[in-house]
């Protein structure tokens, strides 16, 4: 798979589900895909888990994380599921009585593991779809984007300012 494929799949999912508003309701998307979301206190370095027995799956999210982080984690785990990432016992994966558990831990954002990079790109495009980002930017008047604009956009999409900055840069808007 590729990052481009992950981005395309996220955009198609948003379009298919008719998500034309901000913020994108990521929990509703998870539920629609048959991925119930559970909030629990996880290890200090774990943001979320995708737990699957091959038939049923659910997402477990760190209850102590900020809401914007939780939303990104849910979208990230949806990405793993939607992209049908196959995990083997080993790095970031634990096998417990036939259940495969994919952790979103500290290496999820280090840019090394291709599956994690794809899931991160999927999450960014799911939470900040190109069409909606461009529409919101146009509503700001068309001038250069300043820090307070990035903050406004991050608030509208309920993502971190860092995530919004990266997304705007990737779209050539910064």
Residue ranges and their predicted role:
Residues 1-174:
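Active-site hotspot residues in diverse enzymes, especially metal/ion-binding acidic/histidine motifs
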């Amino acid at each position: 798979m590729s990052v481009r494929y992950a981005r395309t799949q996220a955009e198609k999912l948003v379009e298919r589900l008719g998500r034309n508003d901000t913020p994108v309701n990521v929990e509703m998307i998870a539920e629609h895909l048959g991925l119930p979301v559970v909030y629990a206190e996880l290890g200090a370095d774990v943001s979320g888990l995708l737990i699957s027995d091959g038939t049923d799956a659910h997402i477990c999210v760190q209850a102590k994380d900020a809401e914007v982080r939780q939303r990104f984690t849910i979208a990230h785990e949806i990405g793993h599921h939607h992209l049908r990432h196959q995990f083997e016992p080993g790095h970031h994966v634990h096998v417990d009585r036939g259940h495969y558990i994919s952790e979103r831990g500290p290496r999820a954002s280090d840019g090394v593991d291709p599956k994690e990079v794809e899931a991160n790109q999927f999450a960014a495009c799911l939470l900040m779809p190109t069409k909606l980002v461009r529409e919101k930017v146009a509503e700001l008047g068309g001038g250069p984007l300043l820090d307070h604009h990035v903050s406004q956009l991050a608030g509208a999409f309920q993502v971190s300012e860092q995530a919004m900055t990266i997304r705007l840069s990737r779209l050539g808007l910064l």
